[in-house]
Amino acid sequence: MRADKDLAFMLQYENIAWYNGGEVRILDRRCYPRKVEFVVCKTHQEVAQAIADMVTQSAGPYTAAAMGMALAAYECRDMTADRKLAYLEDAADVIANARPTTAQRMRLIVDGCIEAAKTAILSGADVSAAIVDHTIAMNDLRYGKVEKMAEYLVDMFPNNGGVMTQCFGETIVGQMLKIAKQRKKNIRLFCPETRPYFQGARLTATVCHDMGFDVTVITDNMPAYVMQNEQIDVFTSAADAICMDGYVVNKVGTFQIAIVAKYMGIPYFVTGAPDQGHTDVDTVTIEMRDPDFVLQAMGVKTACDGVKGYYPSFDITPPHLVSGVVTDTGIYSPYDLHRYFADGNMGEYRQSAPVV
């Protein structure tokens, strides 16, 4: 049984990104849920561009990247084995670097696909099919790990508690809600809208609603008021990177909510495995995106001509604002993340299942 069973529509593998017959279909999260549309990519370069263009985000690019590698394998299907591997290595570089801040994790994904391709080439199997099978196996593994994270996270939720989220944490949102439902924890969710793409309003809130929870969307300037007046018990987010020195890289706005949570005495739990590729915060590159997006809302211009925008995609939260890093094996202090790997863990995105 696949690990996406019983999760919301947009967390089903086929509705994230899927390779079939020489193309990759990616759910266009820029317009979901108002419209359910898929962007069709005919080349691996188009997959990389779709990732860069935010067609999919949060953990969506990791599935899209793997499916893009399946497409690259289709593109080079008639080449010799050596040329095929060289082509896939080049495709891996293009896809892994589609967005700079997440390049470390993306590299783990595409490298796993290359290992699956090598096995398929040696056995004479269909390389694209092998990469798709590998991706499903790795998604099942990752979803299973995130389900364990969710179990530890939901331990921190009081019955009938209030939980504030940030942006769209993808798999952890669905698994967190599934576990809360199983435990009959009747939590209320408050989702900051997350401008300029509105991931909180459109994606997180939709998943919460689809899974039967009481969910309220708030604007990005309301967290302090809501924490003060609506009985928020926990603030939680996923992370685009958790540095080994305890700094958390996530959607811009996370830092300011963490500051308010600390002031209010509300714990902030971040979910995800530490990133060994980010030994400290100085290894992080913050992606700067098109500032024009800040001057509009869902395509409607909100500022006059001549006004400038500013759009860092991520910010960095220091460890003293983090109550705990919730992993698949327990909750760690942000100051003691090396212990996660000392305990024998490999991380959320690192290949730790057999290549199929």
Q: Which stretches of residues belong to each language-model region?
A:
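SAM-dependent methyltransferases
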Residues: 1-26, 122-125, 334-335, 339-356
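Glycine/charged-rich beta-loop-alpha catalytic/anionic-binding loops adjacent to active sites
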Residues: 30-33, 38, 42-52, 131-136, ...
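Histidine-anchored nucleotide/phosphate-binding helix
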Residues: 173-182, 258
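Structural signal for hydrophobic packing residues in well-ordered secondary-structure cores
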Residues: 55, 73, 77-80, 92-99, ...
